[in-house]
Design a protein with these regions (language model features):
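Catalytic, metal-anchored helix/loop core of enzyme active sites in primary metabolism
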Residues: 1-382
Length: 382
């Protein structure tokens, strides 16, 4: 039986690479549903090629245009809106949901998919950043597997396969360091979005590329790792590794370290989440260790305040990571549209952390309210 896959965010970087994986294994996987936020033309194109049972465009303004583009594909049902996203993931035939949407918007459909007992292939890290405790509780309650798609978390996951109950001493989470690794604070003050969008080793969407430049992305990955692997933040060490060959590693209680290495290719962790515990053939480049040295550096927390703030947020707990995520989404977008300086992003996030209402034991409704409040506060400072 082919696995039926729903891709939330099929037009983005992860979504398009996931479709490439599916294309390479048509005997194993089938797309049941594809979704997008605004890119209705690309979504229609994908629907024509992969013929899913349904497509959902989150922005309802594009519904009629999408419907018209797929008028000659009556077997593809067209839906629109956030509610449709929540409902489609519950469809009975779906086996796996790949959450490749960007940002807070991924939270609600992920919760619905868990409650419908679908296997979650998690690429939307913000879901665990915002509501990690709630998501883990639900996954336990509904006995749902969450398989990481982020290259680093996939590497940690792969390093833990076969380890059973063996105790983790610490997690070594690697980071490329982004395009400004060697910049001084003065130089960083003047950088523009175009500079930040030139990532040295990975090809990603705009939002995550900016988060990588500020190292907020790595901060979010620390939070994600805490929830996925049950390891406290003080046992998650970030290593700047410019070559992006060692995707992450785990040190065990006997001092042994297991790591996963490979060329920077997101299709590998996507495919492993789809095929786990099996490994399938995948076309593409192979690692050549003779090509370059492997270097590791300590991150500069003064220069990259966003990474430090993520550690502070997880140590505070409660809704603080949710507040940080909301403020970050606002300043990230503002920076991309030249309405906010690069270092100003961190300043606004820090001020939002101080001003927003802290809730030690948040419910789902608290997360929704905290997200809205933090966005208002951050917006007011732009």
């Amino acid at each position: 039986m082919k696995k039926q896959i729903c891709i939330l965010g099929s037009t983005g970087s992860i979504g398009t690479q996931a479709l490439d994986v599916i294309k390479q294994h048509p005997d194993r996987y089938e797309t049941y549903c594809l979704t997008a936020n605004n890119q209705y033309m690309k979504l229609a194109e994908q629907a024509r090629e992969f013929r899913p049972a349904a497509v959902v465009i989150a922005n309802e303004q594009h519904y009629e245009a999408l419907k018209a583009l797929l008028a000659d594909c009556p077997e593809v049902k067209v839906y629109a809106g956030a509610k449709a996203l929540d409902e489609i993931v519950e469809a009975q035939p779906i086996d796996m949901v790949l959450t490749a949407m960007v940002g807070y918007a991924g939270l609600s459909p992920t919760i619905h998919a868990i409650k419908a007992r679908k296997t979650i292939c998690l690429a939307n890290k913000e879901t665990l950043v915002v509501a990690g405790e709630l998501i883990c509780q639900l996954a336990n309650e509904y006995r749902v597997n969450i398989l990481p798609v982020d290259s680093e978390h996939s590497a940690i996951f792969q390093s833990l396969v076969g380890e059973g109950r063996n105790e983790i001493d610490k997690i070594l989470l690697t980071a490329s360091g982004g395009p400004f690794r060697k910049f001084t604070l003065e130089q960083m003050r003047d950088v523009k979005a175009a500079d930040a969008l030139k990532h040295p080793t990975w090809d990603m969407g705009a939002k995550i590329t900016i988060d990588s430049a500020s190292m907020m992305n790595k901060g979010f990955e620390v939070i994600e790792a805490k929830w996925l692997f049950g390891v406290s933040a003080d046992r998650i060490q970030v290593l700047v590794h410019p070559q992006s060959i060692v995707h992450s590693a785990v040190q065990f209680s006997d001092g042994a370290v297991k790591a996963q290495l490979g060329v920077p290719d997101m299709r590998l962790p996507i495919q492993y989440a789809f095929s786990y515990p099996d490994r399938l053939p995948l076309n593409g480049d192979r690692l050549d260790l003779f090509k370059q040295p492997l270097e590791f550096f300590e991150p500069d927390m003064e220069k990259f305040r966003c990474l430090q703030m993520a550690y502070e947020a997880i140590n505070q707990g409660g809704n603080m990571p949710c507040i940080v995520n909301a403020a970050n989404e606002i300043v990230n977008e503002a920076f991309r549209h030249d309405r906010c300086g690069f270092l100003q992003m961190g300043e606004i996030i820090e001020a939002t952390m101080q001003k927003a209402t802290f809730i030690a034991r948040p419910t789902y409704d608290d997360y929704v309210a905290s997200d809205a409040e933090a966005r208002r506060i951050a917006n007011a400072m732009l």
